[in-house]
Regions:
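Alpha-helical scaffold segments in carbohydrate-active enzymes
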Residues: 95, 99-102, 131, 159-164, ...
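Short secondary-structure junctions and interdomain/linker hinges
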Residues: 114, 139, 194-197, 211
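A contiguous, mid-protein "functional segment" used to position or interact
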Residues: 174-209
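Short amphipathic alpha-helical interaction/hinge segments
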Residues: 104, 108-111, 164, 169, ...
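GST-like domain detector, emphasizing the conserved glutathione-binding G-site
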Residues: 1-146, 217-219, 223-230
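Long, charge-rich low-complexity segments
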Residues: 197-229
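GST superfamily/GST-like fold recognition
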Residues: 146-172, 179-185, 190
Length: 230
């Protein structure tokens, strides 16, 4: 009997995107249900201890939460395996996957309230970005992905933040990656990868821009007007 999967999501959530990338890369069919983040239903809060997405519902009865746990579960139950076979490499991948919350502050740059705040957020993001550049220098391969030619779970973990950062960087350049050629190349490979592109809603760039406009922060002035975008 085929296992049934339902992914509970917000349309712009990077952590859901990570789970969706893994599902797409493994060719797993799944249903997606979007939750109103401003009015989260009781049934959802009952299965999500943090009242957050993603939640993966398996066969209508098992609710898994936290993107890392979901990704690891999917890698255990479906081919192709997205973790390296070598135990040292696998542990290293998991360690750098645990670093994603530090790096994901690049997605918060768009929340700056003014130019000074914007510059401060970019400067703060230099530390995790530089450390990630250093990790890529020591990975022992030429890419394009973290482990070389094969797309892995660690790639799925970083792709959502890098895609959203790139949207921002194109409308209001940050200079964050100017001296980080390996991180730039990795970013370019990830944001062009089919599972990454297919793991979000259609016209996701427009959806992201709409969210930024709704937030009403300083970077809104650099977006094309909604009328022009249409």
């Amino acid at each position: 009997m085929t296992t049934r999967f339902k992914l509970c999501s917000f349309k712009t959530c990077p952590w859901v995107h990570r789970a969706a990338i893994v599902l797409r890369e493994k060719g797993i069919d799944y249903e997606i249900e979007y939750i109103d983040r401003h009015n989260r239903p009781d049934w959802f809060q009952a299965i999500s201890p943090h009242s957050k997405v993603p939640v993966l519902i398996v066969d209508g009865e098992h609710a898994l939460f936290e993107s890392n746990a979901i990704a690891e579960y999917l890698d255990e139950v479906a081919e192709p395996r997205l973790h390296p076979e070598d135990p040292i490499l696998r542990a290293r991948n998991r360690a750098w996957t645990d670093y994603v919350p530090n790096f994901s502050q690049v997605t918060h740059i768009s929340n700056a309230v003014d130019e000074d705040d914007f510059n401060a957020r970019v400067e703060k993001a230099q530390i995790p970005a530089s450390r990630l550049e250093g990790a890529l220098e020591k990975r022992g391969n030429d890419g394009p992905f973290f482990n070389g030619e094969k797309f892995s779970l660690v790639d799925a973990a970083y792709a959502p933040a890098l895609l959203r950062f790139t949207f921002l960087d194109r409308v209001r350049p940050t200079g964050l990656l100017d001296d980080k050629p390996l991180l730039t190349a990795w970013r370019d490979a990830l944001i062009a990868y089919p599972a990454v592109l297919n793991g979000v809603v259609p016209e996701f760039h427009d959806v992201w821009q709409d969210q930024v406009r709704t937030n009403g922060k300083w970077v809104v002035q650099f977006l094309p007007s909604a009328a022009a975008a249409e």
